[in-house]
C-alpha cells in the first residue's frame, strides 16, 4: 500500500508552517470544519499537499470549474508523482437535458456528446478508490450528481486470479452483464475480444493497456498486461479486477426486482393522471415507460436508466442519491477550493434540477422516481462530509461561522506585500488613469482595469486604443481558450492594458501587472463588494512595485473593509520581512505554461473562418478525419475546450459533405 509522499525542492516557508500545524491540530482533534484563509500567492496548494502527506487519507478536492480542476490536478500530480491523482468532472462536452415547454408543446430530447477521455478518467478515479488509499481526486461540483451505487459497482467487479477454476464463457457472460461489449474488430475501451483460449479485455479505466487472460481448459493459466496499440506484453499479473463499464451497471437480480417496482409506480401514476383527466399525459407515460422496461429486461439497461436509479438502488422516495463521495472510505478528507465561489454552486444545483423535472413529471414524460436522479441538496452534502478544509482568500460567512479553526496564511514565501491602495476622485478619472498607464508602461509593466459594465469596458478600450495605448478587453462572452491567449499576449507585451468587468477568475495572477485600477469603486453591489474588492486587489499582489487605484467620491463600507484588511495584511508582511531580512521579489513565472493553450487558440481562429465553402466532398472528408484525430488527441491531453471547438467544426463539415 503506497503512502503519500511530496516531491518538491521547496520546504514550507512564511506562514505555511504555522498554517499546516494549526489545520493538522484541528483535524486531529476531530473538528469537522476548518478554514485556510490564504492570500493570493501564499502557496495554498503546497499547504494542502503537506496536510495530505501528514494525514495519509484518501482526499477529495472540490473546484468550481473544469479549468481550475485541471490546473489543480496538474499541480498535485507534480507534488505526488508516486501516488494516484485523478480528475473527475462532468463527461459531457455538450449536454442538453430532456425538457418540455408546455407553452409551445415542445419536448426536447436529451442530447449529449460524451467525452470518452473524461469518462475513462472518471472510471479510473472510482476504481482507484477500491484498490488503494493513497488517492487524491480533484473534482468539479458535478461530483454531487447521482452516480451508480458503489456497493453494486463493487459487487459486479470481476476478480480474476492465476490458477483460478473459471470457464471462459462464464467470464464472457459476466463481462456482458457489466456492460462490456464483444468487438473483435474495433478493440477499444470497455470492449473484449476472443481468440481461441485467449480473452483480451480493455478495462473501462484505461484505453492504452489491455488485460490478456490465457486459459488451459477451465483454468486461468496466465494473466498478462499488454500495450493496446503495439500488442507488446508489459508484464505478468497474479490478480486483476475488472470494474464495470458503466457506473450504472446492475446485476440481473437487481434488474428483476426493479422492473416490478417500476411497473407498480407506473400503475399508480397512471391512476393519478386518469383521475385528473390527463389522458394524453397518461398515454405518453405508458408508452415511454413500457419501452424503457422492455429495454431493461432485454439489455440490462436503457437510455436514461439513471432516471430509475432510486428504484435500482432500492432507496425510499426523497432519499439522497449515491455520489462520488459515497465511493470514498468514511475517514476521507475534503478540501473545497475557492470556497466562496464553490459552495454557492453546490447550493444552487438542486433547485435548477427540480424545476426542470417538475414539468417532465407533470406532463407524463417521466415517472416521479426521476425526481431522485438529482444532485445532492446542500444539507445532504453537509451530512456526507467527514472533515473539510475550506480554502479561500475571502471565505464567506458560512465558512467563518462553521469553522472551529481558521488558519491565516498572510506571509508569502517570496516576501511580496499586499499592494498599496490609493483613492482618487471620480471626476477626471479617465485622464488621470491615462497618465498612470503611461507611467506604468514606461517602467515596463502592465495594467488591469475593472469597470462595472461591458459597454464601459468596450468604450474605454476603444478610447485607449485611439490614444495609442495597446489595450484590449475581456468579458464573459470570451471563451477559456481566447481568454488564455489574451493573458499570454498581455504577459508578452502584445498588450499593455487589459480592461474587464470581473477580473477575479483563476489564471489572472500576472507578475507583470503593476497597476490595478478599479473604476466606480464606490458603487455598492456584487462587483464592488468586500470580497470582490479584496480579490481584485489580489491581482496586484505578484509584483513588488504594484499598486491599486480606486476611483471613488465616497468610501463605502465594502471599500473601508477591503482597505482595512489589505492594510492589516501589509503591516504583518512588512514586519515579518524586516524581522527576517527579506526583500520582496516579483514572482518569476514563465510564460511557457500558457503556450499550449495559446497554440490551441491560434489554431482555433482558423476554424472560425469560412474555409468550408470552397471544399470538395473529398477534401471535406479528409479534413473531417484530420479534425477527428486532432479532437481525440486534444481530449487526451485534457484540452477540452479545443476538443469542443474541433467537434463543432466537424459537425459543420459533415453538413457540407
UniProtKB/Swiss-Prot annotation:
GO cellular component, one term: excinuclease repair complex
NCBIfam families: PRK05298.1 (NF003673), uvrb (TIGR00631)
Source organism per UniProt: Clostridium botulinum (strain Eklund 17B / Type B)
Residue numbers covered by motif Beta-hairpin: 91-114
Keywords on record: ATP-binding, Cytoplasm, DNA damage, DNA excision, DNA repair, Excision nuclease, Helicase, Hydrolase, Nucleotide-binding, SOS response
Single biological process term from Gene Ontology: SOS response
Listed SUPFAM superfamilies: C-terminal UvrC-binding domain of UvrB, P-loop containing nucleoside triphosphate hydrolases
Record-given protein name: UvrABC system protein B
SMART domains: DEXDc, HELICc
Chain's role: The UvrABC repair system catalyzes the recognition and processing of DNA lesions. A damage recognition complex composed of 2 UvrA and 2 UvrB subunits scans DNA for abnormalities. Upon binding of the UvrA(2)B(2) complex to a putative damaged site, the DNA wraps around one UvrB monomer. DNA wrap is dependent on ATP binding by UvrB and probably causes local melting of the DNA helix, facilitating insertion of UvrB beta-hairpin between the DNA strands. Then UvrB probes one DNA strand for the presence of a lesion.
Domain called Helicase C-terminal: residue spans: 429-595
Domain UVR: 621-656
Subunit structure: Forms a heterotetramer with UvrA during the search for lesions. Interacts with UvrC in an incision complex.
Family to which the UniProt record says this protein belongs: Belongs to the UvrB family.
Positions of disulphide bridges: none
Domain Helicase ATP-binding: residue ranges: 25-182
Binding site for ATP: 38-45
GO terms assigned for molecular function: ATP binding; ATP hydrolysis activity; DNA binding; excinuclease ABC activity; helicase activity
Subcellular location: Cytoplasm
PROSITE patterns the UniProt entry points to: HELICASE_ATP_BIND_1 (PS51192), HELICASE_CTER (PS51194), UVR (PS50151)
Pfam families: Helicase_C, ResIII, UVR, UvrB, UvrB_inter
Description of its domains: The beta-hairpin motif is involved in DNA binding.
Amino acid at each position: 500500500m503506497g503512502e503519500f509522499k511530496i516531491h518538491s525542492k521547496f520546504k514550507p516557508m512564511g506562514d505555511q508552517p504555522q498554517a499546516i500545524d494549526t489545520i493538522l491540530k484541528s483535524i486531529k482533534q476531530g473538528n469537522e470544519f476548518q478554514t485556510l484563509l490564504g492570500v493570493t500567492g501564499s502557496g495554498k496548494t503546497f499547504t494542502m499537499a503537506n496536510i495530505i502527506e501528514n494525514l495519509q487519507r484518501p482526499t477529495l478536492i472540490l473546484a468550481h470549474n473544469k479549468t481550475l480542476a485541471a490546473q489543480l490536478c496538474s499541480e498535485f500530480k507534480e507534488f505526488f508523482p508516486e501516488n494516484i491523482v485523478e480528475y473527475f468532472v462532468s463527461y459531457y462536452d455538450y449536454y442538453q437535458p430532456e425538457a418540455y415547454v408546455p407553452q409551445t408543446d415542445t419536448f426536447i430530447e436529451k442530447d449529449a456528446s460524451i467525452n470518452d477521455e473524461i469518462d475513462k478518467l472518471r472510471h479510473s478515479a472510482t476504481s482507484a478508490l477500491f484498490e488503494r488509499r493513497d488517492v487524491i481526486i480533484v473534482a468539479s461540483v458535478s461530483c454531487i450528481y447521482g452516480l451508480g451505487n458503489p456497493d453494486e459497482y463493487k459487487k459486479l467487479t470481476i476478480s480474476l486470479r492465476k490458477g483460478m477454476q473459471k470457464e471462459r464463457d462464464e467470464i464472457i457472460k459476466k463481462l456482458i452483464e457489466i456492460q462490456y461489449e464483444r468487438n473483435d474488430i474495433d478493440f477499444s475501451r470497455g470492449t473484449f475480444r476472443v481468440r481461441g483460449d485467449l480473452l483480451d479485455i480493455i478495462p473501462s479505466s484505461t484505453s492504452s493497456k489491455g488485460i490478456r487472460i490465457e486459459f488451459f481448459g477451465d483454468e486461468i493459466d496466465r494473466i498478462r498486461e499488454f500495450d493496446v496499440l503495439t500488442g507488446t506484453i508489459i508484464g505478468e499479473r497474479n490478480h486483476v479486477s475488472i470494474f464495470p463499464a458503466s457506473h450504472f451497471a446492475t446485476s440481473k437480480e437487481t434488474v428483476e426486482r426493479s422492473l416490478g417496482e417500476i411497473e407498480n409506480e407506473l400503475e399508480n401514476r397512471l391512476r393519478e393522471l386518469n383521475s385528473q383527466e390527463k389522458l394524453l399525459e397518461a398515454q405518453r407515460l405508458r408508452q415511454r415507460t413500457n419501452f424503457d422496461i422492455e429495454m431493461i429486461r432485454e439489455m440490462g439497461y436503457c437510455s436514461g436508466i439513471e432516471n430509475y436509479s432510486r428504484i435500482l438502488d432500492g432507496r425510499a422516495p426523497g432519499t439522497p442519491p449515491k455520489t462520488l463521495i459515497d465511493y470514498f472510505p468514511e475517514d476521507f478528507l475534503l478540501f473545497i477550493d475557492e470556497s466562496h465561489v464553490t459552495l454557492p454552486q453546490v447550493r444552487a444545483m438542486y433547485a435548477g434540477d427540480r424545476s426542470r423535472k417538475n414539468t417532465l413529471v407533470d406532463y407524463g414524460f417521466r415517472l416521479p422516481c426521476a425526481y431522485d436522479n438529482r444532485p445532492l441538496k446542500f444539507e445532504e452534502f453537509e451530512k456526507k462530509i467527514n472533515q473539510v478544509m475550506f480554502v479561500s482568500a475571502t471565505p464567506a460567512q458560512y465558512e467563518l461561522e462553521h469553522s472551529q479553526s481558521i488558519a491565516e496564511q498572510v506571509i508569502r514565501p517570496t516576501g511580496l506585500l499586499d499592494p498599496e491602495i490609493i483613492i482618487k476622485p471620480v471626476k477626471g478619472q479617465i485622464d488621470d488613469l491615462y497618465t498612470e498607464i503611461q507611467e506604468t508602461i514606461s517602467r515596463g509593466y502592465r495594467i488591469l482595469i475593472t469597470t462595472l459594465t461591458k459597454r464601459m469596458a468596450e468604450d474605454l478600450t476603444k478610447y485607449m486604443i485611439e490614444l495609442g495605448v495597446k489595450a484590449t478587453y475581456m468579458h464573459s462572452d470570451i471563451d477559456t481558450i481566447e481568454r488564455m491567449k489574451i493573458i499570454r499576449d498581455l504577459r508578452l507585451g502584445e498588450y499593455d492594458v487589459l480592461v474587464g468587468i470581473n477580473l477575479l477568475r483563476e489564471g489572472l495572477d500576472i507578475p507583470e501587472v503593476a497597476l490595478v485600477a478599479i473604476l466606480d469603486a464606490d458603487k455598492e453591489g456584487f462587483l464592488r463588494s468586500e470580497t470582490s474588492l479584496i480579490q481584485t486587489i489580489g491581482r496586484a499582489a505578484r509584483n513588488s512595485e504594484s499598486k491599486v487605484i480606486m476611483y471613488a467620491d465616497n468610501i463605502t463600507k465594502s471599500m473601508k473593509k477591503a482597505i482595512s484588511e489589505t492594510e492589516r495584511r501589509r503591516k504583518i508582511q512588512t514586519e515579518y520581512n524586516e524581522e527576517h531580512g527579506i526583500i520582496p521579489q516579483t514572482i518569476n513565472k514563465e510564460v511557457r505554461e500558457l503556450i499550449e493553450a495559446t497554440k490551441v487558440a491560434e489554431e482555433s481562429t482558423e476554424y472560425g473562418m469560412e474555409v468550408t465553402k470552397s471544399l470538395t466532398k473529398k477534401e471535406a472528408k479528409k479534413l473531417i478525419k484530420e479534425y477527428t484525430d486532432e479532437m481525440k488527441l486534444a481530449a487526451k491531453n485534457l484540452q477540452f475546450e479545443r476538443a469542443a471547438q474541433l467537434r463543432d467544426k466537424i459537425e459543420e463539415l459533415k453538413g457540407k459533405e
